[in-house]
Amino acid sequence: MAKVQYMGTGRRKKSVARVRLVPGEGRVIVNNREIETYFGLETLRVVVNQPLVLTETKDKYDVLVNVHGGGLSGQAGAIRHGISRALLKADENLRPELKKAGFLTRDPRMVERKKCGLKKARRSPQFSKR
């Protein structure tokens, strides 16, 4: 018999995470590495685990993630988004608390492009009066 698994796709900035929830004991594996080795910062690990802690499903599922693009912060946000969507497929009754925490909303903020004549997106060259 096929194993039950729930899929979810999360995005943040330039990162895209494909998340699979499989019934298990709470391990999180990102790109075939344990979460502790992939994310060095504790804050990023906390961000990834937020939906599981909020819904009290940390010990019910193993989380298998493929993530690419962007930096570590964007990837952590994308994984959080993907886990939240996968949890919804597992149990629709979790929607109100996930929605209230803001985990189901795709963060629309993207990097603003650099404009010509300026040093960065908004930073102008230093002004000299004389």
From Swiss-Prot:
Pfam families: Ribosomal_S9. GO terms for molecular function: RNA binding; structural constituent of ribosome. The lineage of its organism: Bacteria, Bacillati, Bacillota, Clostridia, Eubacteriales. GO terms for cellular component: cytosolic small ribosomal subunit. Belongs to the universal ribosomal protein uS9 family. PANTHER family: RIBOSOMAL PROTEIN S9, SMALL RIBOSOMAL SUBUNIT PROTEIN US9M. It comes from the Bacteria. This is Small ribosomal subunit protein uS9. GO terms for biological process: translation. Keywords: Ribonucleoprotein, Ribosomal protein.
